[in-house]
Each structure stands twice: as structure tokens, then as C-alpha cells.
UniProtKB/Swiss-Prot annotation:
Location(s) in or outside the cell: Nucleus, Nucleolus
The organism of origin for this protein: Kluyveromyces lactis (strain ATCC 8585 / CBS 2359 / DSM 70799 / NBRC 1267 / NRRL Y-1140 / WM37) (Yeast)
Region forming the signal peptide: none
Protein name per its UniProtKB record: rRNA-processing protein EFG1
Keyword rRNA processing: yes
Length: 228
């Protein structure tokens, strides 16, 4: 009788342990992972198979939560690091959008004005919906140096930045047309921004993960694209 009552309780305890780390910080989750790994390492020979399976599943869940916590950490770090850049770019993009809108209202049939409004709309949506997990690439970078004075390595880096900016901008345009932007144009005009739990628009998952792991924690002293 007592043996039967322990299994549901063990499953219940494991569920509670896993639930307690959902949304928690990376350090707390790492501690839980170490505890479970230590238990499996030291007592695997004496633990029932059902408990081993349960703990291994719990371990998988904890590792998933750790990954999510690390991505949240990157998002918070980027939000703080690029706050002022995005603030000024959002103001500039919104001003340009409003100016372009007035032109279209004044002359609705003018194709040039329509194209200008389209570009300004994409720019505004780009600034607001740019992914939190990626190093922010400014739409209006400062410090335009003479190309002749730049080294080949710097030129290559600028070309790569331009290509990535275009890639993100094209994705924003696509989602704008599909109505799938995390923050829509109408919401932006109401003053809304990305929710703290939203990642923004995303490219292929591998690229986002590469940015999160390789760049965000290892390029503290690297010059930002905004200042290139």
C-alpha cells in the first residue's frame, strides 16, 4: 500500500520542481539540473526504473528551461544595451512615416509618394519589431567614413551588416503584408512596443541561436554596428 502511494507523490514532486523553475533565472535552473544529475549519478543502481525515467524527463525539461532563461537574459541585455539607439531611431522613423503619410493624403495618386510611404512604414515596423535576441542593426547608422580609407576587413564587415539589415527588413515587409508582425503598424501608431516576453521578428532559428551564443556573450568590447 505504501509502495503504491510513493510513485504518484514522486511524480507530483518532480512536476512541482519543474514548475518552480519556469520563468526563473539561469542560476536557479542550473542548480536544479546539477541536483538531478547528481541524484541519477549516485543512485541510478538503486532507483526504480520508473523514477529514473521520470528524472531523465525532468532533466530534459530543465535543460529546455535553461535555454529559454539564457535567451531571456540575452533579450534583457540587448534591450538595455540598445535602448537609446532604438529610441532615437523609432522617433526618426515615426517622423518620416507621418511626413510621408501627409504627402499621400495630399496627392493620393502620386506613385512616388506611395512608394515613399511604403518604405517609411517598413522602416518603422523594423525598428519596433527587430528581434531582441540579435545585435541591433541601425537603419540610420552614423559615422559615414570615406570608403577609400577603410580596410578590406572593415569593408567586408560593413557589407555583411548591410546584407543582414536588408534581410531583416525584407522579413519585416513580408510579415507586414501577411499581418503577422509581433507589433502591427496600427499598434505602433498607438504607442505599443514589443512585449518583454516577445522576441520580435526572427530569421532561421540557427541564425538566432548563433547570435545568442556566439555574439551576445563574447563581443562586449566589439564596436556596435550603429557606430560603424
Amino acid at each position: 500500500m505504501s509502495g503504491k502511494s510513493k510513485r504518484p507523490r514522486q511524480r507530483h514532486d518532480s512536476s512541482l520542481q519543474l514548475a518552480s523553475v519556469i520563468g526563473a533565472g539561469a542560476n536557479k535552473i542550473k542548480k536544479q539540473i546539477r541536483n538531478v544529475e547528481r541524484l541519477l549519478q549516485k543512485r541510478r543502481d538503486v532507483l526504480p526504473d520508473t523514477v529514473i525515467v521520470e528524472k531523465e524527463r525532468m532533466l530534459e525539461g530543465l535543460k529546455f528551461e535553461l535555454k529559454e532563461a539564457e535567451l531571456r537574459q540575452v533579450g534583457r541585455k540587448n534591450a538595455k544595451k540598445y535602448h537609446m539607439v532604438r529610441f532615437f531611431e523609432r522617433k526618426k522613423a515615426l517622423r518620416r512615416y507621418k511626413q510621408a503619410s501627409k504627402k499621400v493624403i495630399a496627392d493620393p495618386e502620386n506613385k512616388r509618394f506611395q512608394n515613399e510611404l511604403r518604405d517609411c512604414t517598413i522602416d518603422l515596423c523594423y525598428v519596433v519589431n527587430f528581434p531582441r535576441l540579435s545585435k541591433y542593426i541601425a537603419l540610420y547608422p552614423t559615422g559615414s567614413s570615406d570608403a577609400k580609407e577603410l580596410s578590406e576587413e572593415v569593408k567586408k564587415g560593413l557589407d555583411s551588416t548591410d546584407a543582414k539589415r536588408t534581410e531583416f527588413r525584407n522579413l519585416v515587409a513580408k510579415q507586414l503584408d501577411e499581418g503577422t508582425l509581433p507589433v502591427s503598424l496600427s499598434q505602433i501608431l498607438e504607442g505599443k512596443r514589443l512585449n518583454k516576453d516577445s522576441t520580435g521578428v526572427m530569421l532561421e532559428e540557427e541564425q538566432v541561436e548563433e547570435e545568442a551564443t556566439e555574439k551576445q556573450f563574447n563581443d562586449e568590447e566589439e564596436e556596435d554596428d550603429f557606430f560603424e
